[in-house]
Amino acid sequence: MATTTQHMNQIFLVLLLISFAISPAISTVPKECETDSTDSCIDKTKALPLKIVAIVAILVTSMIGVAAPLFSRYVTFLHPDGKIFMIIKCFASGIILGTGFMHVLPDSFEMLSSPCLEDNPWHKFPFTGFVAMLSGLVTLAIDSIATSLYTKKAVADDSEERTTPMIIQIDHLPLTTKERSSTCSKQLLRYRVIATVLELGIIVHSVVIGLSLGATNDTCTIKGLIAALCFHQMFEGMGLGGCILQAEYTNVKKFVMAFFFAVTTPSGIALGIALSSVYKDNSPTALITVGLLNACSAGLLIYMALVDLLAAEFMGSMLQRSVKLQLNCFGAALLGCGGMSVLAKWA
């Protein structure tokens, strides 16, 4: 129960920091950057019902996506240890990688190179690449330190268990059994670190995506975004759900993590609707704030997708035993990246 509370506190802290970061974005827009009021797609009255549809549709698809892996152990052909689940997980990892490279990173480049920003310093230094690079390195540090702390805690707990009489029975087990237990324990710790860090990264960019959709009154843009984001959230949820499943959390913690993933984007949309009259997505402050958040999120998602998800699976024993399965998983990952690349046309 304590770990669940800690996890909830982490998520609330991230959401609070994002709120403070976005609040200065309520500012004036330079005349040359103002939206063309004669555009037939700009209609606040028609946009509101579409945004409400978006909240419901994205909430439902997010719940389906993140919940599907959690119930897969009850479906024989989708068992977490099976080949089909591995292929689906690689596809979902490809979705996350495609999100970082084809959606979040380009958005950051576009925002931080906007003509609405001053030449000095925004047009004289590649801030997006720099911040994304730092984000990847910081994620590596967090990943490493968190794993180290989890491992030390597990070793301490194991030492306490050794002081009990139960160790007499355990010592009679074959060495290979104890080694296997130790290996499984270390792998479980890695899964838990991955699930936590990935969820925090997804929450950051989900709030930004939702805010952008909620703040815009462009009905043409909203219509395309609804379908694209439903697809995106469903399969990104499958990737996260697979990590949560492998982490073997308690049912309460699984529910908490799934709940926060499902409601983050709809909450961002609701926040965008509330701020739509004062929030200007092309104001300098908004461009800088959201652009830097996107760069941070992109670095984190790219690192997690490549290092903690795809590389970990491809170098794992299951895929290393079968070249055919490796090719199938590579094709699935490529398909996931390709799907997000196609969606980049609309979202």
From Swiss-Prot:
Residues 73-83, 146-192, 246-254, 308-326 are cytoplasmic. Probably mediates zinc uptake from the rhizosphere. It comes from the Eukaryota. Belongs to the ZIP transporter (TC 2.A.5) family. It is a multi-pass membrane protein. Residues 28-51, 105-124, 214-224, 276-286 are extracellular. NCBIfam families: zip. It is found in: Cell membrane. One of its GO terms (molecular function) is zinc ion transmembrane transporter activity. Its main location: membrane. This is Probable zinc transporter 8. Keywords: Cell membrane, Ion transport, Membrane, Signal, Transmembrane, Transmembrane helix, Transport, Zinc, Zinc transport. Residues 1-27 form the signal peptide. One of its GO terms (cellular component) is plasma membrane. The keyword Magnesium does not apply. GO terms for biological process: zinc ion transmembrane transport. The chain crosses the membrane at residues 52-72, 84-104, 125-145, 193-213, 225-245, 255-275, 287-307, 327-347. Pfam families: Zip.
